[in-house]
Amino acid sequence: MKRSTLLSLDAFAKTEEDVRVRTRAGGLITLSCILTTLFLLVNEWGQFNSVVTRPQLVVDRDRHAKLELNMDVTFPSMPCDLVNLDIMDDSGEMQLDILDAGFTMSRLNSEGRPVGDATELHVGGNGDGTAPVNNDPNYCGPCYGAKDQSQNENLAQEEKVCCQDCDAVRSAYLEAGWAFFDGKNIEQCEREGYVSKINEHLNEGCRIKGSAQINRIQGNLHFAPGKPYQNAYGHFHDTSLYDKTSNLNFNHIINHLSFGKPIQSHSKLLGNDKRHGGAVVATSPLDGRQVFPDRNTHFHQFSYFAKIVPTRYEYLDNVVIETAQFSATFHSRPLAGGRDKDHPNTLHVRGGIPGMFVFFEMSPLKVINKEQHGQTWSGFILNCITSIGGVLAVGTVMDKLFYKAQRSIWGKKSQ
């Protein structure tokens, strides 16, 4: 009884060898099935060994962390002595005149070639970054009316209000809201060589390269002429020297601009740049952009509006890189305002500061790009079995159809 039950459950019924019928069509179908199965198995093996990147969108919970800013910008018609970089955000935090920390400034001649030392930031002095000083212990430099020095005669030397060097006079002028220009006829600036050197550099360009840390909130960074200063009325720059030098402008080349840690380093470490090529482009879409309008842009403001999306890359070798992708929209306008020359129906507001501005806005969402194998082991085995079974099933059906067709044709011929 038990044996007959097992016999009835046998789904693989056998036939005797001497009653089997073999045909040429069956042989061709069998060969085709073998080749098709091998092709599908090789394809499944390739998918199993392939690496894919699967994106995932989550809420960004790292709002307290700083975001790294990396940039390399060239201004062919702005000397390094006049360019300043400020970063401001909606929290009220300001990083003013930060080019002295974390950045290198390279002077460029009219042909765009480097001039002098890339780290040279001081226009006055003895060539070693120091300025000549007055060694008289009783010397008290004049502030030229920018500060009240009327009571100095009644004060001790250490209590007097003095402007001992050119930078002190310039700071006093900024606090008073006065135009400093090039420091001509100011004794401290003449002594330090500031006046002669800054005028010698007015026909040069500047390449600025470096990095800074910014908050993950809305704000802006801007390159503008002259020293920045802040008062109760807002944020300003001393543009006096820029205003009277008509050959200066903020036409520029963005060699590199990115937010977050660069991922090229990991690409080079793995020796597989092609695998990460798309990601590199997404994190720095403005690289190589050149802005040289065919009109006078002396009093012109160039603006980029960047939408930043925090991004994490998780690699198979357990390396995790936190960076950011961004898209940017470009806009430019004359400070004089009025109708746009290219679009007469567009009106520009009047006012502002000449320069290059990048207004950035952070997304509340984060993209996680995770590297994974194309298939798991279980998926690979399942797909292999499915491929083999499917090919055999189709081959069986085709063999039966061909056999019945042959029998039908032979039967008609025999009649």
Curated annotation (Swiss-Prot):
Main location: endoplasmic reticulum
Record topological domains on the Cytoplasmic side: 1-24, 398-415
Keywords: Endoplasmic reticulum, ER-Golgi transport, Golgi apparatus, Membrane, Protein transport, Transmembrane, Transmembrane helix, Transport
Transmembrane segments: 25-45, 377-397
InterPro entries from the UniProt entry: Erv, Erv_C, Erv_N
GO BP terms, alphabetized: endoplasmic reticulum to Golgi vesicle-mediated transport; protein transport; retrograde vesicle-mediated transport, Golgi to endoplasmic reticulum
Cell compartment(s), UniProt: Endoplasmic reticulum membrane; Golgi apparatus membrane
Biological function: Constituent of COPII-coated endoplasmic reticulum-derived transport vesicles. Required for efficient transport of a subset of secretory proteins to the Golgi. The C-terminal Phe-Tyr motif is required for exit from the endoplasmic reticulum. Facilitates retrograde transport from the Golgi to the endoplasmic reticulum.
Protein's name in the database: ER-derived vesicles protein ERV46
Organism per entry: Saccharomyces cerevisiae (strain ATCC 204508 / S288c)
